C-alpha cells in the first residue's frame, strides 16, 4: 500500500510447523539443537551417529519431531507414553539458542498436547530440573502445575509438571 509516499508493509506472519523425524538426514539438526542445550538438560553430548540410531529404532511408544520456523529447523521435541495409560510425556524439548524466547517452545508444547489428545491421552507430563528456569517458566506459562519433586537439594533436583488436556 502507498501512504503519503511511504510503502507500508504487512507484518510477517510467523509460521511454525512440526514434522515427525523419520530420516537420518534430519538427525544432523537434532544433534546440533540438542547438544547446544545438553548442559541445561544435564545430559552428555550425543553424537550424530547415536541420533541416527535413536531415530531409526522405530519405537512405537515414542515419536521425534523437528520444529521449524518456516523452513529453518529451530527445535526438537520427543514425546513418549503413546502405547499405555492415560498420560503422555514430553521427554525432550530443546530449542536452538538463536530462536529461544520466540514462541517455539510454546508451539512445541501445544503441538504435543494436540498430538496426545488425538491419541486419547488425558494428561501430559514433563520432567525438568530445578535449575532449568526457562523450561519451568514455559511450562507454568502453558498452564502446567507442579505435581512432584525429588529434593536432594542440588541443581539436578527433578520436578514433574502435569496438565489435564
Language model regions located:
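Conserved glycine-rich acetyl-CoA-binding loop
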Residues: 72, 92, 96-110, 119, ...
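Conserved beta-strand-loop-alpha-helix junction that forms the acyl-donor binding cleft
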Residues: 126-136, 152-157
